[in-house]
Swiss-Prot record:
Residues 86-192 form the HTH APSES-type domain. Transcription factor that regulates asexual reproduction. Binds the StuA-response elements (StRE) with the consensus sequence 5'-(A/T)CGCG(T/A)N(A/C)-3' at the promoters of target genes. Differentially regulates the development of macroconidia, microconidia, and chlamydospores. Acts as a positive regulator for the development of macroconidia and as a negative regulator for the development of chlamydospores. Involved in microconidium formation specifically in infected plants. The keyword Transcription regulation applies. It comes from Fusarium oxysporum. The gene is STUA. This is Cell pattern formation-associated protein STUA.
């Protein structure tokens, strides 16, 4: 017993001489060399877990002379004599678990880290069991996990740890599979010689466990989202000449966005800054009227000084607030819709109070590109309601391309009392150079109600198929002859039973009937009655042969 302790220093020196790596096992798994005292637990080889090394030293006396006594380690916690523990670890991506692998007799047997299940198919293959017996044993297991896809060493039937240990003890392959059944098998990986590899494998396992949170990056504390990035009407971020007020002014940054380095009277977006409008603006804003035919996305803001203008959230110079302050209205008020004229749409900037005197001269050119009726009066304000069908009709484009009711809007806009004409590009223009608003003077504000209550008006365009169809249908309904009404209760006596055109049928009385012509008809003579007895002898009875030769 005293001579057993120096042996680990001789066999398991820090240099690990190569002759000690040989496996001294025969084909049946029994050790061929006899050792008086067994080697300590594998923790003496790997000095990291100190508690386990002490436990292995305490278990030495009870495990002495295992080969001579025929004792067999059924726990799988002690390494056989002269055997170095060899274990590898790979990440099983399909299952999201780390797998420890031990090779025995050229077969790789794997054990999972999360639930410690062991591949029973590979374990019984190490025992040299036939396929039929192996499959029969594994099918009888109550707790099993069948893996049919993946790497070859991971396929098979996975069984719990205790059942795998029982099979290994029955087949006498527990020592051959060392250190597969070691409880703290992960500690065998933390060795100074393979610390880099161990750290890489464990880091990969941690990344696999937390891969759901790996793609989320926390935003920078000072990086506020730009309104232009989230709103379809806004242009991109400016490239130069801007001082972000959110960083320069401190806590007041939430009320304003980056502004260009120009005079203080530069107007914000004249349409009321519809930044919180509903989600149909991608569809509507692309078809808003633009007088010069350019891209509507590039003409939404003033570009006189070379800055794509950003709309502020709470700027006091917003023209819609000065022009009536109806930004929080619903937009279905009839009075607002009746007085929604072209003058209001064009003179939004010119009719402002005297706080902004220089706007008429400095921003006269961008107005045709910016003003259109639904946004000029503050109708498309900040706190827009959900879905207003009437407002969708008035916000439609005059060229009739964006919604179902735009054809009627186009037809009614062409019937105007002024001298405006339709440009070849489909946009309505005036002689003063300003863009035509979305709602003209000749258009009724009660468009949807007119469709339900009024007769469709004929348009001057002969090719307006929708108009011609409505007018033709209306004329047909007026000039059609009403169908006759039949009253089953008040109608006159039916002529079916007693019709004057039909004579009554004669009634025949069999008793009082005169002699019928059927019995004795004068037209048909009575048939002669032949009496064969009184008949004179005829030539028929005489033989013809006598008459012929007589």
């Amino acid at each position: 017993m005293n001579q057993g302790h120096p042996q680990p220093d001789m066999y398991y020196s820090p240099h690990y001489s190569t002759p000690q790596y040989g496996y001294g096992y025969s084909t049946n798994g029994a050790p061929t060399t006899a050792v008086s005292t067994p080697m300590p637990a594998p923790q003496n080889v790997l000095p990291v877990p100190s508690a386990l090394s002490n436990q292995g030293a305490m278990q030495q006396p009870g495990y002495s002379n295992s080969s001579n006594n025929g004792a067999f380690d059924t726990t799988g916690q002690h390494n056989p004599p002269g055997m170095k523990p060899r274990v590898t670890a790979t990440l099983w991506e399909d299952e999201g678990s780390l797998c420890f692998q031990v090779e025995a007799r050229g077969i790789c047997v794997a054990r999972r880290e999360d639930n410690h299940m062991i591949n029973g198919t590979k374990l019984l293959n190490v025992a040299g069991m036939t396929r039929g017996r192996r499959d029969g044993i594994l099918k009888s297991e109550k707790v099993r996990h069948v893996v049919k896809i993946g790497p070859m060493h991971l396929k098979g039937v996975w069984i719990p740890y205790d059942r795998a240990l029982d099979f290994a003890n029955k087949e006498k392959i527990t020592e051959l599979l060392f250190p597969l059944f070691v409880h703290n098998i992960g500690a065998l990986l933390y060795h100074p010689s393979n610390s880099n590899r161990t750290s890489q494998v464990m880091a990969a396992a941690e990344r696999r466990k937390h891969e759901g949170l790996g793609g989320q990056r926390p935003a920078a504390p000072n990086a506020l989202p730009s309104i232009g990035q989230h709103h379809p009407m806004m242009p991109g971020l400016p490239t130069g000449g801007y001082v972000p007020q959110s960083l320069a002014n401190g806590p007041q940054s939430l009320a304003s966005t980056p502004q260009p380095l120009t005079n203080g009277s530069q107007p914000p977006m004249p349409n009321g800054g519809g930044m919180l409008k509903r989600g149909r603006e991608e569809e509507e804003d692309l078809h808003r009227p633009v007088s010069n035919g350019h891209d509507p996305m590039s003409n939404m803001h003033a570009m006189s000084n070379g800055y794509p203008q950003q709309p502020p959230l709470a700027n006091v110079h917003q023209p819609p607030m000065q022009n009536g302050g109806d930004m929080l209205k619903r937009g279905r008020d009839e009075d607002d819709e009746v007085h929604r004229s072209a003058h209001t749409a064009h003179d939004t900037m010119n009719n402002m109070p005297g706080s902004m005197p220089g706007l008429s001269n400095a921003y006269a050119q961008p107005l045709p590109n910016v003003h259109h009726q639904p946004l000029a009066n503050g109708d498309g304000g900040m706190l827009k309601r959900g879905r207003d069908e009437d407002d969708d009709v008035h916000r439609s484009s005059p060229n009739g391309h964006d919604s179902a009711g735009n054809f009627e809007v186009k037809r009614r806009k062409t019937i105007t009392s002024n001298d405006s004409m339709v440009s070849p590009g489909g946009f309505y223009t005036l002689h003063n150079g300003y863009g035509q608003p979305g709602v003209m003077n000749g258009m009724s504000p009660y468009k949807r109600r007119d469709d339900e209550a009024e007769t469709p008006r004929p348009g001057p365009n002969v090719h307006d198929h929708l108009n011609n169809f409505d007018l033709k249908r209306h004329k047909t309904m007026e000039t059609s002859v009403p169908a006759p009404q039949y009253d089953a209760m008040n109608r006159p006596h039916s002529s079916i039973g007693t019709s004057p055109t039909y004579a009554p049928a004669p009634v025949y009385d069999n008793l009082a009937r005169p002699a019928s012509t059927v019995a004795a008809s004068p037209s048909y003579p009575s048939a002669p009655v032949y009496d064969t007895g009184a008949r004179p002898p005829s030539a028929i009875s005489a033989p013809r042969r006598q008459q012929s030769f007589g």
